[in-house]
């Protein structure tokens, strides 16, 4: 995921859990390097030597780096947008009216409880990380540009505007509010040679780990059985599999799934692999999905499909899965729906918007963690409030994802900051720990260390009548994923061989009362932070 981020819907960034392994730990730091894991790094007061990470109240804290003297030579202007004292970041923001009306990106002003602005969120999330991260004598400085529109022409024009400012990195917050930016914009910025940007992750790359996970799990547990979790018209039939997936040049590579599925005796029925197109303009997506829904569902139904392996996405601006499930009900067809973890079908908040008659037959793999009573599952909010407290500052998980990536690259690249060292640092950035029952992924920590990255998932089914906070983000409502085996998570190669007890409430958990003790971080004090009496004021107060 070469310096990429998820550029779809609600960008909730989570970093997953495996033991921290820092190559060359406890070695001598090399001149010009960050000295990640060196003896010098582990000896710093900012470092917790037991974890090898800085004392940041977040399970995705970066690895410790070596000491830095304020008057040391960092190389000065090592790259475009970089000087001895600063790193230039240009941020594309949506028009203010769209920013305030959107819930994509989850922007919230803690002082008012209302939607906040992207600009304020960037500055306030920046303050959280600037407090604890090592940036080698440089300060990250932001310049904001308002997006001119959402269509391809506007995206290309905005890319020209921001790249002309010669930044080290460009952040796209406009896409969260469907107020501009997006795939075309991000690709154009990367093509212009901005050091800290590569093209956004394609649907093909994003979905490969999901395809392999689903192929193994469904191959082991579902192939050869009856569609017992479907509606009355299919539940006594042998399973017949069909696929829904995003097509086109930048779409999903279906062969990854079909070849892996075949290893377990699985196959997609003839004519039952149906693709749909996704316009680059988010404002055009809803109409496009509606136009494609009827023939798409009819094709699956006519092929005798009992079990839909659903790689379609879901979001607030455009909801492919919501559109397709509503069409299935209108055609009086109630198959099993396989939850693949395709963004963001496995988030309670979005799944509540699907046709509930259909989604009551949904089960499969969920990446997001169960809700924890009191909102403790939201590690990003907990980190934000560790610094700002609970009554000030503008917080956004989506904006945090962009700023977090920037700081991780800058800190672990070391003083010699270039596009290549930034890229290499993100490639080496370790997958991160905690997150309830061994949540594992390296999709969001930078570049995966292999062409197809790790992605651990829990097994769950949809309970349309359950109430409570959404998994991961806590938004209350009706409808929740029920997790099997206490929320245990599996990596590829480790999925159970036998069919698990889906749709059995007695063997499922909807949420945790508290974070498991083994997944707690710290606690670490936040010294001189607004939450502990520091004088920093949030951006919205200026």
Predicted regions and their residues:
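Periplasmic-binding protein-like
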Residues: 162-178, 194-200, 240-245, 301-324, ...
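Solvent-exposed, acidic/polar segments of extracytosolic/periplasmic ligand-binding ectodomains
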Residues: 35-76, 80, 431-542
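Extracellular/periplasmic Venus flytrap/periplasmic-binding protein
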Residues: 150-153, 202-331
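N-terminal extracellular/periplasmic Venus flytrap/periplasmic-binding protein-like
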Residues: 31-161
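C-terminal region of N-terminal signal peptides and the immediate post-cleavage residues
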Residues: 18-36
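Extracellular/periplasmic periplasmic-binding protein-like sensory domains
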Residues: 327-402, 412-413, 505, 510
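Short, charged, surface-exposed loops that flank catalytic or proteolytic processing sites
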Residues: 138, 393, 411-424
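Beta-alpha junction/loop-to-helix N-cap segments that form part of ligand/metal-binding clefts
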Residues: 43, 73-77, 117-123, 131-212, ...
